[in-house]
Regions:
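Bacterial N-terminal signal peptides that target proteins for export
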Residues: 1-7
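Bacterial N-terminal signal peptides
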Residues: 8-18
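Helix-turn/linker elements and helix-coil junctions of extended alpha-helical scaffolds
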Residues: 47, 87-91, 195
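Low-complexity, Ser/Thr/Pro/Gly-enriched N-terminal "stalk/linker" regions
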Residues: 22-74, 81, 85, 105-112
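Intrinsically disordered or highly flexible coil/loop and linker segments, enriched in small
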Residues: 49-53, 92, 175, 219
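Glycine- and acidic
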Residues: 61-66, 92, 120-125
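Long, charge-dense tracts
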Residues: 95-96
Length: 220
């Protein structure tokens, strides 16, 4: 057995280094960017063109007629939240930087459509059901993560419309669970961008987690 192991080791030493090479940091990053584009591109391209509701596939086991409407907000909120830190790096004169520049522009135009009542992709964050609070929180977190490249690149009318949609969710009472933090996240964005917030909705969820539910080391 030892002889076999020794022989394999000797043979391996003559093989090209690339055969057992691990991906470099640059290769890893390129893969992650490629994956990001695959996920975000269908959402942002269609949203920017006003065709998200027209082209986005929809499947659901729920009989709730509002479920389809929810799916569009989920796609937009989670996409914006997920890619915002990357977008905030800003455009650069590199391959990745040019890709990033493209998606900053798509996201900004997409957000304009998402809150424009005249757009076919207008997303209403009303209280017909409770899910809009969750979707608004993801969108709010994305805007907080990219204050320069997203919020800072929006025109004042779009900013005002986003504020209006976020405030609509104040009529939704969060469940006594992690949903409390969804309300807190919305208010944190309103505080950041307008300097106005609902004290109860901002602090109640945060204090509930800190004082009653958080046990330490990510345990609740």
């Amino acid at each position: 057995m030892k002889t076999k192991v020794w022989l394999l080791a000797v043979l391996a030493s003559f093989l090209p280094n690339g055969l057992f090479a691990h991906p470099t940091g640059g290769e890893d990053r390129a893969y992650w960017v490629e994956t990001l584009v695959k996920i975000a591109d269908p959402v942002l391209v269609n949203l920017s063109e006003g065709t998200l509701k027209k082209n986005m596939p929809f499947e659901s086991l729920s009989d709730d007629p509002l479920r389809k409407d929810v799916s569009y907000r989920e796609a937009v909120g989670r996409t914006i939240c997920g890619i915002a830190p990357w977008l905030e790096l800003g455009p650069e004169d590199t391959k990745e930087g040019k890709i990033r520049s493209k998606y900053i522009k798509l996201a900004v135009q997409g957000l304009r459509n998402a809150v424009n009542p005249q757009s076919p992709d207008y997303l209403v964050f009303d209280n017909r059901h409770s899910q809009p609070l969750v979707d608004a929180a993801f969108l709010a977190q994305g805007l907080l993560r990219a204050p320069r490249q997203l919020w800072g690149n929006l025109d004042s009318e779009t900013q005002s419309r986003i504020i209006t949609e976020l405030k609509r969710t104040r009529t939704i009472k969060p469940k006594e669970s992690n949903w409390l933090l969804f309300a807190s996240m919305v208010e944190a964005a309103l505080l950041e961008f307008t300097n106005e917030y609902d004290t109860q909705r901002l602090y109640y969820g945060v204090n509930r987690f800190l004082d009653n539910w958080y046990k330490g080391d990510a345990w609740y």
